Amino acid sequence: MIPAKTLGAVRVGSVDRIRPAAEALRDIVADLTGLRCAVTDNIAVQEPMKDGAGEILASAVFGFATGDDARWWRFPQLALTSPLPMACRFESEPFWCNAQGIHTPTPNLLLSALDLSNFRERALTSAAIVAPVHLPFGQIAAASFLSPDPEVDDLSAPFEQHGEALALLARTFVASYVKVTERRRPSVATALLSKREVECLRWAAAGKTNDEIGTILGLQRTTVRFHIRSASVKLDAVNRDQTLFKAAQLGFLAMIR
């Protein structure tokens, strides 16, 4: 159990608190496990996390300033090839991984299908404990905890002892950071779609045309178009594709298997 005071130290309450919270996360993790932190608030974007003064946390706080150490945040396209962020797309629990496999508390068949070849070169580490953080709007963040010795390839012991604590610390820091740096319009919180609008969007997301959706739901094509257009206005979207994207971000569209 992590004391409330410890969690409070890594929680970002304002932009001015970003730097102290990041430093607290770094120090708490080092004291607890001896590991380093590498944190990103969104594996899909190129912009690194920054403090209130615009300093990049990866270099200024977490110590990834030069050489290979800095590659993971200086070249964000690595997120497209590294097995670490890829695993975070399919897993929500903390895990540890090395070239031999991705080790989770609960078996995950999707992870077993990931390519781990050339692990050291692609992941920029021999082993890592990873805490995925799944946030609103489909945003995926991740915190990786790494040995100071790049040759260490077994983190099973610290994962067994502290994996859940590391995940809680990471979630508290990242989720609060995202809240204080939020740039979306508040109006997005008022978007309420009707049952029929969601049905039409769900089938549209499955690739169905308005005619096909009308046949499935027993509606006229013009009625289907009306419902999709209505959803578009509510979601402040400019076209059908953006409407589907925003509806998916907000969790209105269930997966069609």
Model-derived segments and their meaning:
Residues 4-12, 23-134:
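Regulatory input/activation interfaces that engage signals or partners
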